UniProtKB/Swiss-Prot annotation:
Lineage of the species this protein comes from: Bacteria, Pseudomonadati, Chlorobiota, Chlorobiia, Chlorobiales
Gene3D superfamilies, A to Z: HUPs, Pantoate-beta-alanine ligase, C-terminal domain
Gene Ontology molecular function: ATP binding; pantoate-beta-alanine ligase activity
Metabolic or biological pathway: Cofactor biosynthesis; (R)-pantothenate biosynthesis; (R)-pantothenate from (R)-pantoate and beta-alanine: step 1/1
Protein's name in the database: Pantothenate synthetase
One Pfam family hit: Pantoate_ligase
């Protein structure tokens, strides 16, 4: 595995790979690799001849009161995991090479990036869209693998790729869960043992939604309220939001229509730790 830190060098390598008809897959991360990331790399490895992994803790997607400086950066451990996962190129630039002093241009995501996570984290998705676009231009992949765990981020990226006519296929990888249903996440390290033991409540909420829909219950607002109550009644937990959205448009939905696909989005706090989860629901 070759480690690259300079954007121009990575671009030159990617251009040469394309000229040599190599099929490139990219996985973009902020490091602190876990089983979820490794599943994305595995999917890329199965789908592409050359796999590029990016590690970059993107400052433009962190808010003023968020944990940019506390975000874990176990680089040597990440290198070992990436090597074992048979990554071909690890692109790990410094912030100054991606956002030099005179950098001014950013992307605006519109309404999709302003609700739910975007409402609670103003500017977050603009930062995500900007860095993803930059990394796509630098690594020049044919496919890019993103996890379904960050469902709104995935929707924003798909919308951006379509709107900007970017020449890349976005592939979604399923959520990887722990035994109790907790979605694997870099933020799980902040959970106490007690919080981790009860963290399956979010997945239980998804299961409750699936069961309710299977029983022909159609009022999604009522189901969402029931899940909120489930979370609120779990010691140490408080819900932030529980919302159903139309899977195609990613707009809030209140009544389920037969045969239509929805996405249940959940965000909740365990103490000071904020976690998100989601599940696909078919009416």
């Amino acid at each position: 595995m070759q480690i690259i830190t300079e954007p121009r060098q990575m671009q030159a390598i990617a251009e040469k790979l394309r000229l040599n008809r190599q099929f490139i897959g990219v996985v973009m991360t902020m490091g602190a690799l876990h089983e979820g990331h490794l599943s994305l790399i595995k999917l890329a490895r199965q789908s592409a001849g050359t796999v590029i992994l990016t590690i970059f803790v993107n400052p433009s997607q962190f808010g003023a009161n968020e944990d940019l400086h506390q975000y874990p950066r176990p680089f040597e451990q990440d290198v070992a995991l990436a090597t074992a996962a048979e990554v071909d190129y690890l692109f790990a630039p410094e912030a100054g090479t991606i956002y030099p002093e005179n950098h001014q241009t950013t992307l605006q995501c519109g309404a999709l990036g302003e609700r739910l996570e975007g409402e609670r984290r103003p500017g977050h998705f603009n930062g995500v869209a900007t860095i993803v676009t930059k990394l796509l231009h630098i690594t020049k992949p044919h496919i890019a693998i993103f996890g379904e765990k960050d469902a709104q981020q995935l929707a924003v990226i798909r919308r951006m790729v379509e709107d900007l006519n970017l020449d890349v296929k976005i592939i979604a990888a399923p959520i990887i869960r722990e035994e109790n249903g907790l979605a694997v996440s870099s933020r799980n390290i902040y959970l106490s043992n007690t919080e981790r033991s009860t963290a399956g409540i979010l997945y239980q909420g998804i299961c409750h939604a699936e069961k309710s829909i299977a029983e022909q219950k159609k009022n999604l607002s009522v189901i969402a309220a029931e899940i909120e109550q489930m979370i609120a009644s779990t010691p140490g937990w408080r819900p932030d939001y529980v919302v159903f959205v139309d899977e195609e448009r990613f707009e809030p939905a209140e009544i389920a229509e037969e045969g239509k696909e929805y996405r249940l989005l959940l965000a909740a706090y365990a103490g000071k730790v904020r976690l998100i989860d989601n599940g696909k629901i078919v009416a």
